[in-house]
């Protein structure tokens, strides 16, 4: 095997290892939220604001993407991706998150925060600009 192929092979292995290690530390959640119908409009305003500010202002917040069920508008899902546990903990302490959390406590009927395992972590950089 010539030197050029060895260098290319080494670079490829190094890149794959780096991506795998990076994604091992990432936190991925799919928040499952049910909102009381009478508070839905106000809740959506809070959610959109905190998600926008978090992505704009926090380097460790890769994605906060809110979605609403087409079948039941009171069911909200938020795709949450943080660069690390430290980024997640930092996010919880921000003024905009605290405003959201305290402002919506009475609006939320049910909340689940399951941690997810990405099945194709190598595509993260293709999808999320902040991962590049």
Each model region followed by its residue ranges:
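N-terminal secretory signal peptides that target proteins for export/translocation
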Residues: 1-3
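Sec-dependent N-terminal signal peptides
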Residues: 6-15
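Glycine-rich beta-strand-turn "strand-cap" elements at beta-sheet edges
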Residues: 21-28, 65-72, 101-132
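N-terminal targeting signals for Sec/Tat export/insertion, comprising classic cleavable signal peptides
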Residues: 27-57
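Sec/Tat signal peptide C-region and signal peptidase I cleavage site
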Residues: 16-20
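Short, well-ordered beta-strand segments in beta-rich or mixed alpha/beta enzyme
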Residues: 26-34, 63-92, 130
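An amphipathic, aromatic/His-enriched active-site/gating alpha helix that lines ligand/cofactor pockets
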Residues: 53-63, 81-116
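Alpha-helix boundary/capping residues
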Residues: 13-14, 47-50, 95, 104-107, ...
């Amino acid at each position: 095997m010539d030197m050029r192929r060895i260098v290319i092979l080494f670079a490829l292995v190094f890149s794959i290892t780096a991506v795998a290690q990076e994604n091992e530390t990432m936190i991925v959640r799919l928040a499952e939220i049910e909102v009381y119908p009478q508070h839905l409009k106000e809740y959506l305003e809070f959610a959109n604001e905190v998600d926008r500010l978090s992505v704009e202002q926090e380097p460790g917040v890769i994605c906060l993407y809110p979605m609403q069920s087409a079948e039941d508008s009171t069911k909200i899902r938020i795709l949450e991706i943080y660069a690390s546990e430290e980024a997640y903990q930092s996010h919880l302490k921000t003024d905009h998150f605290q405003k959201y959390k305290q402002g919506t406590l009475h609006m939320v009927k049910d909340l689940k925060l399951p941690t997810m395992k990405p099945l194709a972590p190598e595509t993260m950089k293709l999808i999320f600009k902040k991962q590049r």
